[in-house]
Amino acid sequence: MRRAAWGAAVVLMLTGAARAAPPSAGRVELVAGEGLNEPFGVEFDRESRTYIVEMGGHRVTVLDAKGARRVLADDFKGPHHLLLGPDGALYVTDTWNYRVRRFDLRTGASTVVAGTGEKGFSGDGGPATAAQFGGIFSIAFDKRTLYICDLDNRRVRAVDLKTGVVRTVAGNGEKGVPRDGEDARAQPLFDPRAIAVDVKGNLYICERGGHALRVVDPAGRIRTVAGTGVAGMSGDGGPALSAQLNGPKHIFVEPSGSVLITDTENHVIRRYSPRDGTIRRVAGTGVLGAGGLGGPALECALNRPHGAVIHPKTGALYIADSENHRVLRVPRDQ
């Protein structure tokens, strides 16, 4: 599969009122943006619907294939992330209600799959629905497991999708920098904010406070792959371990295996390549702003983005440009 390239791609704002140009220009008819309140994440279902989680709006908004908009649910408290599960249901992190909710997209029924609704740390070895979490900011899936980024407890926990039992897979609850090559469960984490899993079973952990990207291999060993640990903006085009990040908030594993890092406080989207260990900027100028719509992705200013994902069918890059209260689409170069 050829990697998507966006360096010279056109950036489109998806507004609530406007309709995009014909697809011959690489544009699609999507509706989003106007009326949004701090969009933090974007997801797509198998019926070409788009889902936007609004942290400030405490809701999930749905856009159908024709652009019609509706609210899926609006009874969250600061939701940060959403993800389609292997069962086709939509899972949402109800962050400050300390739980994960599952939505059956056929019936609209909602159930809690993890968390009691009270903040704390308990429940490993038992049902996830009876376990306490300390702020659920991100989730990830493989075929058998729901992974939960338990930020305030400085742990990543895993729920067996068959049994519903929860356990810790990374983090010992302490705040610190983990040692490379050690058992991830015995090591500290530095404010783990987001997680993602690749097809090889590697679990990536994005640390907001550690300004770094870690990875836990299938054997359970952790190591740092990006970031010096000091906040800053440097290193594009070179080794990721020599680059500076600044409060990254989201990660997404591309089909190629590369990892998109939403480098929030630098107002950019960056790509880490595990093949050669390099990092580079793919969207955003590095300066807070809102200008540049209609131009190259690298010349489009962002304002504290909190999510970046790839559309599974078109290969386009979608950015939750949170403090600009909009969603951006960057078409894949043809």
Regions found by a protein language model. Give the residues of each.
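A short loop-to-beta-strand structural motif that recurs across blades of beta-propeller domains
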Residues: 58-61, 98-101, 154-158, 165, ...
